[in-house]
Curated annotation (Swiss-Prot):
Keywords: Glycoprotein, Repeat, Secreted, Signal. InterPro entries: Gal_Oxase/kelch_b-propeller, Gal_Oxidase_central_sf, Glyoxal_oxidase_N, GO-like_E_set, Ig-like_fold, Ig_E-set, WSC_carb-bd. Residues 166-190 are annotated as: Disordered. SUPFAM superfamilies: E set domains, Galactose oxidase, central domain. Its main location: secreted. It comes from Arthroderma benhamiae (strain ATCC MYA-4681 / CBS 112371). Residues 62-160, 195-289, 307-404 form the WSC domain. Glycans are attached at N90, N290, N333, N387, N455, N552, N758, N833. It is found in: Secreted. It comes from the Eukaryota. Pfam families: Glyoxal_oxid_N (PF07250), GO-like_E_set (PF09118), WSC (PF01822). This is WSC domain-containing protein ARB_07867. Residues 1-24 form the signal peptide.
Amino acid sequence: MAGILSVVHIIIIFIVRFKSSTDSLITVVVSASFQRANIYKFSLLAKLAHGAALIPRADADTWTYLGCYTDQVGARTLGQVGYTLGGPGNMTVANCQNGCASQGYSLAGVEYSSECWCDNQLRNGGGPAPDGEAMCSMPCNGNPEQKCGGPGRLNLYQNTAIKPTDTMTTSAPSTETGSPTTTSVPEPTQGLPDGWQYSGCYQDNVNGGRVMFKMLPDSSTLTIESCVAMCVKLGYTVAGAEYSKQCFCDNYLRNAAPQAIESECSMTCSGNTQQKCGGPSRLSVYSKGNLTVLPIPVPQTGGLPGGWKYQGCLQDNVNMKRTFPYQIVDKTNNTATNCLSRCSKFGFGAGGMTYSEECFCGDFEDIAAAGAKLVPEAMCSQTCSGNATAICGAGNLITYYRWMDEPLQKWNRPTGINAGRYDFLIGGVLVPLITTVGINGKITFQEKSGTGDPNTTGAYEFDPYYEKDFSKAWREMHVKTDIFCAGGLVLPDKVGRQLTVGGWSGISTEGVRLYWPDGSPGKPGVNDWHESPDDLRLQNGRWYPTAMTMSNGSILVVGGEEGSNGAPVPTLEILPRVGPVLFMDWLKRTDPNNLYPYLTPLPGGNILAAYYNEARILDERTFDTVKTLPNIPGAVNNDAGGRTYPLEGTMVLLPQKAPYTEPLGVLICGGSTPYGGDALDNCVSIQPEVPNAEWVIERMPSKRVLTCMAGLPDGTFLILNGARKGVAGFGLAEDPNLGAVLYDPSKPVNQRMSIMANTTIARMYHSEAILMADGRVLVSGSDPQDPRFPQERRVEVFLPPYILSGARRPTFTIANKDWAYGGKYKIKITSGNQSRIKISLMGMVSSTHGNSFGSRTIFPAFSCSFGTCTITAPPDSHTCPPGWFMLFVLDGPTPSVASFVRIGGDPGRLGDWPATGGFPLPGV
């Protein structure tokens, strides 16, 4: 077409760096190639210099939407690439329309979230999609509220101000380039790394996507050497140069990339005109060693873990709502196997992958709740970051799988009396922080000062004998220092004194307080809490410490902080004092998420410490680490989830049964994720002394933080209180969890939980749950300092099904309540069916912040004859540390009222301690 200007290519790039609200730096790069020289002059530059618009903007009223149209690589419906403001990452409908208008085209089409195509006519048989708008569903990169086509689909617009060409053609449009074209093969390169070679010219943008994974920024100085060097630096073994200035990296070619004729890789490199750097949708490919071309990716349907089955391509983000709630991002190794294994490990039976690198887990019921539907499979088109031959969804689309085998968990849903019941017990006189059952059958309540009621004494004793008579039920007691965030225990001395250590601030953090229980049910005592800070205190001040009775009868005090949100106290010490404190690096490293660490003596002779999301076994003499356990699992989408304060869950010991050959197990339920995220929805258990032991995960029916747990005399555990979101602290949790769960370790794993009755009272931060001597669970407290949830003085009881059944309780008498290890002791059964008798020993518990200090469940050996049962005490102090226990006799599931027995004596001679400060001493 002689005499007519033929502009091969014009590219305008805008880079704006704002220097102030009124001043900016604008860089304009204009690149042009001509078939005839000296014909075209750039009046545009003059316009730019005078502040004209950088890109001509189309009038929005002149564009008409035509619909969703078909497209295919190699036979494009629109033949020209549209160059847009901000490039593919900022693609919007308007940007594409403006780009096409600025190039003089009347048709504009957006595709695959990031592509803009222009022309004045439809080509290669392209037309309205046979499935309508279904596959034009991908959001625009620059505006997710708009649709930018899909795989092989264009959202097509026409500028009515420009008359399009009516002629259709099946031939490809002429290739327009930004550099002169030739048909020669690439110039041999020098200086490539050893083993690298030219592998040929290959097609890009085929079969629904790019054929190489990593796209580097465009370069105006690109050479083959520089492209290969950048890929080598990033760890890749394949490099591809495209369109003169683009460099791609990968370890193979994807999407069954077909080889093109060499003449199609004809654009010279922007940094070396003697080299060829691909062409439009053509790659000059270099590889280290042989080149691998992967097949077209498909959803993985074989080799799936467990009972997973492929279901199809599922919508996500319908009406801005995620289909599945838990997201895991894996930029390098997302596969169906990895994703689904994670989901089912944590008890989720629906899930899948999206956007190449994202894994989602949830339940089948989530799909309907989100309004998500299955769509044509081809719409899920992105390859997995960990498997380039498999599909992992697309934008807002999930490659969806469902667990089709036996259910991952079976939650029992009892009704009526079998679900238990909450009952109001009595109005309180304080908001308790610590509750402890005494061997006198009464329960001590202690509250913090400062934020507590101004007219209380900080401590009271509750006598259940008078639970119907408020005036007699509460006995006033007194403490001198603030027990806020202290730890508590029942000591193994012969009178079962109660101990609290640590506190809120100053001298309180060093506090050591003792109470000698006296009186009996219906008979008031006279003793009070005793402390003498000048004579007896901890070596280190501690806020949130743990106290534990060791196998030798001494008291181990571990961890804490210097005061409220203070520096860590990464030490441990022993009471009575036998030496200086010992530094523990693991306490310092995991602060502040390790407060109130979980501790227990182990039958093998050492000590288990579990804290934050870690656990280890300590030598009971040196406290050196002898074994590090696997990290404690957190949330399905967050390994940083933790179990100890402030990510507060609860640990208990699973029941021990004579002859005590089964390794001891521990159970931890609830917790949270850092920074006030979702609470954890699982329990985990482990037998720490078993070689190569792993944590077993059991999903709970609901999320729970600020968890409380109470062991019951039948060997089950009641899980209650807390919230579904947040962490421990004032005002840091929300969405109260009002339901109770019963955990029965005698049942198979993942079938142990029953959904029990609900309460109407939110039990949030600073709530407690503790087993009473009559088998009920006393539920108290809630002190979140949050206007959404009141300070809670009301005291409830949870009545397990064995209380509500109406069955008559067994009764017994006992003479000897001070047992030696391995000794045999007789009780007289005065009522009950001897053939159904079971006997349990429940450790005396002090409950605070979800902790159940002293919790232990033992089913000892026994034999019965003619109404007399002989019980064999546990064999040693590692199986059963010295201490006080509630002895229950059960007739089937129905427990007696407990008697209090001591096992193992007082080997640490705590009865003679402290010999200072005027403390009353019971002796040994």
